[in-house]
From Swiss-Prot:
This is Pro-epidermal growth factor. One of its GO terms (biological process) is epidermal growth factor receptor signaling pathway. SUPFAM superfamilies: EGF/Laminin (SSF57196), Growth factor receptor domain (SSF57184), YWTD domain (SSF63825). PROSITE patterns: ASX_HYDROXYL (PS00010), EGF_1 (PS00022), EGF_2 (PS01186), EGF_3 (PS50026), EGF_CA (PS01187), LDLRB (PS51120). Interacts with EGFR and promotes EGFR dimerization. Interacts with RHBDF1; may retain EGF in the endoplasmic reticulum and regulates its degradation through the endoplasmic reticulum-associated degradation (ERAD). Interacts with RHBDF2. Keywords: Disulfide bond, EGF-like domain, Glycoprotein, Growth factor, Membrane, Repeat, Signal, Transmembrane, Transmembrane helix. Glycans are attached at residues 38, 104, 117, 148, 404, 815, 926. It is a single-pass type I membrane protein. Residues 1193-1214 are annotated as: Disordered. Residues 23-1031 are extracellular. The keyword Calcium does not apply. The chain crosses the membrane at residues 1032-1051. LDL-receptor class B repeats lie at residues 86-127, 128-169, 170-211, 212-258, 483-523, 524-566, 567-609, 610-653, 654-696.
Length: 1214
């Protein structure tokens, strides 16, 4: 909110006061005074008054503020109003009375008695007179506004009725019921003349006082049809509308370009175009038992002043003539120059100014403890610890009430009279004694925008710049052009004003199912997305210049939002579960949100706060927010949600609104999710999208296809707009102030020829000196009558007029209008309709034909009206899709055509793509491209034509390498230089000799003959494959790690066991003696035999006698033979050897131990050459030490007598 106020600061400084005027929002009738050159007129909003049964009601033209003004008015079918007096006058035919009441429904009183058979009544607001006709007496009578001084103006008339008067022109009109004629006379009763006669009945008469034309309803008794007719005040320029209505019109009233009329039997008020007569809006007044009677549009333009100034009332003249009467007010005699002071002021001694009365100084205020004077008033105050009671006078000590008895909206104080509710400062207690109202209360003092405290108990309402305070001094309305709704209706896009008028189709071609759209106020374009064709398009607001931004790149887009300041747009794709963004030209596309998102639907953007807001309808429904880049995500709401659908932002108050389609509710909160509040529930059907503007929230409903609006603070005052709708989806309000911060002058100079000046979001065109603004408000004309092109000085006055300025006949206008399909909107004050309480099917509409109403299925559906089913045009073969060039896709209520490859279209028609002319063929430079239906052919020199064939270069590519040899690379060679750039996106061009053609080897992510298409499917599969590959890799690594850990554990166990066994040191079982080694065993228990050292194991190998000059050699049978020799020995035995071999003792140990003789000079670790471990055969393990083994062998006498043995090489192992 702070950021928005900062943007509005220059505007606030420029308009440093709060406007208290009441400009309305409607198109200025031709000839009426307008505002500062814009499209609005300064004045209050018009509204209707009508009689209904024995009551009189009022209702806004938009269907809101439907109130009963008079409860017991009798049969009041004849009525009129006096705007300056703010009174309604009506004839009570039952009691034969003329009565009146104020426009707000107060002070009902009798004026005078009337005779029977009164057939018409009108008010002369300039002469202050009442005029009525008597059909039976044939007279027209006049009286003053108090019912005095009655006199007969005209007599001897033929059944006069339907009196109308234009006091400005001093003319009076009436019709003759029997004769079927129209008459005119002066308001004084002279100059009576017949204007025209007809054989048909004239049902009702009304005047267009601005265009100076007389309108009437001409009824054909035989055909039962009516038409709207008009003529000028002299009876000339008669115009008959071609459109016939089956309604029997009872009363009518004109305002602007519209006629409001009621019928004899239907409980509705119709709005029609006064030129064409076509019905535009049907205002359904159900529940009601009788049709409405008299009807009038109340607005000052309906009763202008004689001097031609429609706004110069006596009250305004008084304000202009007050002179030095400061602080004065206009009294009962506004034309006098006497100053009259308002309450709280007193006239000064010189009688020229009003001075404030200080009530607190005179002690006549009635305050018990404190008093504070203000200009024109005062208020009571209380010290700390006391509260002001609801009477505004007494103070009471603050004693809180028990919590169980307090039902106050703010707080409660316990007094001697019991508990009493009180309110905070700047608020007062309402009539119910419980609710507070004021600037500090939730109702904001009843103000729609700004609440400005004047004292602790008084305040006044104000409006933001660009908005105007209305006559109720509470509500604000946007200035500028009238706002309208733009919404998607499944098969088309429509727009309508808030009052149901100008209900038309913007894009009516078959565009599939369109659910998402938004409006760009800068370029005045509409952006929309297709769910069937999977496109995103944009177009002008008149339906022209359609541009396709994305094709086949979205799946189920259901939400779209425009950043009109940042010039980007964002959309949700429920099918792909992500949110994407792009610039407004479809470039720089990026994914904004793709993680932790399920089924996004609605989306809204706040350009000032630079935040995105969206709804998620998935398994975890919630409302979320993030930055425009997708970071800083925040959950706005997650509880009590089922199907959160549409979402929107009130940029003035920084409030967030959303709807839940499943729960049928509308909710609101602050932008951070705080102060969440439920506005409407159970009576909003199946809401899809929401929009907010001014004081109302709009939302679309699928249950009863329509758009509904409620008050944005209370959820009350519900009004439904419908009319041949199928599934109204996304909707936006189009107005310059709906999206603040817009500068339309930035785009094409706002459409202005010379100077464009931005004013509250609208482009104001100005002209340079010496030029005059043209009637279109944008072009400039030279003062000498010639139109000059700005900046060029070119004379364009060649006798050609712009089309918009050419005169157009009424007949031509009717023909143009007749050729267009006019939609009729219906304003439903309640949900009751003429087709019964059950209503029609959601795919049907209630059609009124004369006095009967029936349900009819909409186009594209079949049934009896109560049950309608979709017609599958594709299956029935009734589609418009050409089977040779397109595929028919059925949609609800229609179908679309998806063009085949080689064709392009708009969803209906498919046209052949001329690849040759567009340069998208693949023929190459050496061929001639010929376009064919849906394809093309390439004609190569000397070869037949084939579709899509690439002709090679006439000079065959050389395969000769630098070394003079022919090189072959997988039978493919590179393309010649003439094909440089043939393959796109990094593809490699190759010549395939086998087929004598060229081909592209595309990089990953691209497909096509020239790698021209991005393979999104491959991209998704690649990411899916990478994900699977990553999962497999992780599993494999985990398995390998587990196996390694298992092996490490086994090795550790083995190592531990080995060390444990080696650490044991058992005694040697053999005695160390000089006995013969053959069969001698040492005595048991004899010590002194040491075991083999643990780290050393030796094996004695045979070598040749080096002394004989022979080289050492391997054993005869190899190393394995030596092992085999030991295998047959018993543990502890000594093997006999030859003189060349030493005796070898085998002792069975875990690793084995071979003991050489002690005379071996190579004994010890230094002389070891080879080693091996002997196997174990289950005998007792004996570890023999090196030292002991030497002593053991030296004890053998045979060994000592032998000649020295050749040296043995020994190897140490560990």
């Amino acid at each position: 909110m702070l950021l928005f106020l900062i943007l509005l600061l220059p505007v606030v400084l420029k308009f440093s006061f709060v406007s208290l005027s009441a400009p309305a929002r409607w198109n200025c009738p031709e000839g009426s005074p307008s505002g500062n050159g814009n499209a609005t007129c300064v004045g209050p909003a018009p509204f209707l008054i009508f009689s209904h049964g024995n009551s009189i009601f009022r209702i806004d033209l938009e269907g809101t503020n439907h109130e009963q003004l008079v409860a017991d008015a009798g049969i009041s079918v004849l009525m009129d109003f006096h705007y300056n007096e703010e009174r309604i006058y009506w004839v009570d035919l039952e009691r034969q009375l003329l009565q009146r009441v104020f426009l707000n429904g107060t002070r009902q009183e009798k004026v005078c008695n009337l005779e029977k058979n009164v057939s018409g009544m009108a008010i002369n607001w300039i002469n202050e007179e009442l005029i009525w006709s008597n059909q039976q007496e044939g007279t027209i009578t006049v009286t003053d506004m108090k019912g005095n001084n009655s006199r007969v103006l005209l007599s001897a008339l033929k059944y006069p009725a339907n009196v109308a008067v234009d006091p400005v022109e001093r003319l009076m009109f009436w019709s003759s019921v029997v004769a079927g004629s129209l008459h005119r006379a002066d308001v004084t009763g002279v100059e009576v003349r017949l204007l025209l006669e007809t054989s048909e009945e004239i049902a009702a008469v009304s005047l267009d006082v601005l265009d100076k034309r007389l309108f009437w309803i001409q009824y054909n008794r035989e055909g039962g049809s009516s038409r709207i007719c008009s003529c000028d005040y002299d009876g000339g320029s008669v115009h008959f509308s071609k459109h016939l209505t089956q309604h029997n019109v009872f009363a009518m009233s004109l305002f602007g370009d519209h006629i409001f009329y009621s019928t004899w039997k239907k409980k509705t008020i119709w709005v029609a175009n006064k030129h064409t007569g076509k019905d535009m809006v049907k205002m359904n007044l159900n529940p009601a038992f009788v049709p409405p009677g008299g009807i009038k549009v109340v607005h000052p333009l309906v009763q202008p002043k004689a001097e031609g100034d429609a706004w110069a009332s006596d009250q305004k003249l008084c304000k202009l003539r007050k002179g030095n009467c400061r602080g004065s007010m206009c009294g009962q005699e506004p034309k006098s120059h006497v100053c009259t002071c308002a309450e709280g002021y007193t006239l000064s001694q010189d009688g020229r100014k009003c001075e404030d009365v200080n009530e607190c100084a005179f002690w006549n205020h009635g305050c018990t403890l404190g008093c504070e004077n203000t200009p024109g008033s005062y208020y009571c105050t209380c010290p700390a610890g006391f509260v002001l009671l609801p009477d505004g006078k007494r103070c009471h000590q603050l004693i809180s009430c028990p919590s169980n008895v307090s039902e106050c909206s703010h707080d409660c104080v316990l007094t001697s009279d019991g508990p009493i509710c009180f309110c905070p400062e700047d608020s007062v207690l309402e009539a119910d004694g419980k609710t507070c109202s004021g600037c500090s209360s939730p109702d904001n003092g009843g103000c729609s925008q700004l609440c400005l405290p004047l004292s602790p108990v008084t305040w006044e309402c104000g409006c933001f710049p660009g908005y105007d305070l209305q006559l109720d001094k509470k509500s604000c309305r946007a200035s500028g052009p009238p706002p309208f709704l733009l919404f998607a209706n499944s098969q088309d896009i429509r727009h309508m004003h808030f009052d149901g008028t100008d209900y038309e189709t913007l894009l009516n071609q078959q565009i599939g199912m369109v659910l998402a759209l938004d409006h760009d106020p800068v370029e005045n374009k509409v952006y929309f997305a297709h769910t069937a064709l999977k496109w995103i398009e944009r177009a002008n607001m008149d339906g022209s210049q359609r541009e396709r931004l994305f094709e086949e790149a979205v799946d189920v887009p259901e939400g779209l939002a425009i950043d009109w300041i940042g010039r980007k747009f964002y959309w949700t794709d429920r099918g792909r579960s992500l949110i994407e963004g792009s610039d407004l030209n479809g470039k720089y596309r990026e994914i904004i949100i793709k993680e932790d998102i399920s089924q996004p639907r609605g989306i809204a953007v706040h350009p000032v706060a630079k935040r995105l807001f969206w709804t998620d309808m998935g398994t975890n429904p919630r409302i979320e927010s993030s930055s425009l880049q997708g970071i800083g995500r925040q959950v706005i709401a997650s509880s009590d949600l089922v199907w959160p659908s549409g979402i929107t932002i009130d940029y003035l108050t920084d409030k967030l609104y959303w709807c839940d389609a499943k729960q049928s509710v509308i909710e609101m909160s602050n932008l951070d999710g705080s102060r969440r509040q439920r506005l409407a529930q159970n009576d909003v059907g199946h809401p899809f999208a929401v929009a907010v503007f001014e004081d109302h929230v709009w939302f679309s409903d699928w249950t009863m296809p329509s758009v509904i609006r409620v008050n944005k603070r209370t959820g009350k005052n519900r009004v439904r707009l419908r009319g041949s709708m199928l599934k109204p989806s996304s909707l936006v309000v189009v107005h310059p102030l709906a999206k603040p911060g817009t500068n339309p002058c930035l785009h094409q100079n706002g459409g202005c020829e010379h100077i464009c000046k931005e004013s509250f979001g609208t482009a104001q065109c100005l002209c340079h000196e010496g030029f005059l603004k043209a009637p279109d408000g944008k072009m400039c004309l030279a003062l000498n009558g010639q139109e000059i092109l700005a900046g060029r000085g070119k004379d364009l006055s060649d006798g050609v007029m712009p089309v918009d300025t050419l005169p157009r006949s009424r007949e031509l206008e009717d023909n143009l209008t007749e050729s267009q399909h006019i939609l009729v909107a219906e304003i439903m004050v309640s949900d009751d309709e003429d087709c019964g309480a059950a209503g029609c099917s959601a795919q049907a509409r209630c059609v009124t034909e004369g006095e009967d109403a029936t349900c009819q299925c909409l186009k594209g559906f079949a049934g009896d009206g109560n049950l309608c089913s979709d017609i599958d045009e594709c299956e029935l073969g009734t589609s418009v899709c050409p089977p040779t060039s397109s595929e028919c896709i059925n949609t609800e209520g229609g179908h679309v055509c998806r063009c085949s490859e080689g064709y392009q279209g708009d969803g209906i028609h498919c046209l052949d793509i001329d690849e040759c002319q567009l340069g998208v063929h693949t023929c190459g430079e050496n061929a001639t491209c010929t376009n064919t239906e849906g394809n093309y052919t390439c004609t190569c020199a000397g070869r037949p034509s084939e579709p899509g064939r690439i002709c090679p270069d006439p000079t065959p590519p050389s395969h000769l390498g630098e070394d003079g040899r022919y090189s072959v690379r997988n039978s493919y060679s590179e393309c010649p230089p003439s094909h440089d750039g043939y393959c796109l996106h990094g593809g490699v061009c190759m010549y395939i000799e086998a087929v004598d053609s060229y081909a592209c080897n595309c990089v990953f992510g691209y497909v096509g003959e020239r790698c021209q298409h991005r393979d999104l499917k491959w991209w998704e599969l690649r990411h899916a494959g990478l994900g699977r590959q990553w999962n497999v890799t992780v599993v494999a690594v985990c398995v390998v790690v587990l196996v390694l850990l298992l092996l490490l554990g086994l090795w550790g166990a083995h190592y531990y066991r080995t060390q444990k066994l080696l650490s044991k040191n058992p005694k040697n079982p053999y005695e160390e003696s000089g006995r013969d080694v053959s069969g001698i065993r040492p005595a048991d228990g004899e010590a002194g035999m040491s075991s083999c050292p643990q780290p050393w194991f030796v094996v004695i190998k045979e070598h040749q006698n080096l002394r004989n000059g022979s080289q050492p050699g391997a054993p005869k049978d190899g190393l394995g033979a030596d092992v085999g020799q030991f295998s047959s020995l018993e543990p502890g035995s000594l093997q006999p050897t030859s003189w060349r071999k030493e005796p070898q003792m085998y002792m069975d140990t875990e690793q084995g131990c071979c003991i050489p003789s002690s005379s071996d000079k190579g004994s010890g670790p230094q002389g070891i050459g080879y080693s091996f471990h002997l196997p174990s055969y289950g005998a007792r393990s004996i570890a023999v030490g090196v030292e002991k083994s030497h002593s053991l062998l030296s004890a053998n006498p045979l060994r000592q007598q032998r000649a020295p043995d050749p040296p043995h090489q020994m190897e140490l192992t560990q």
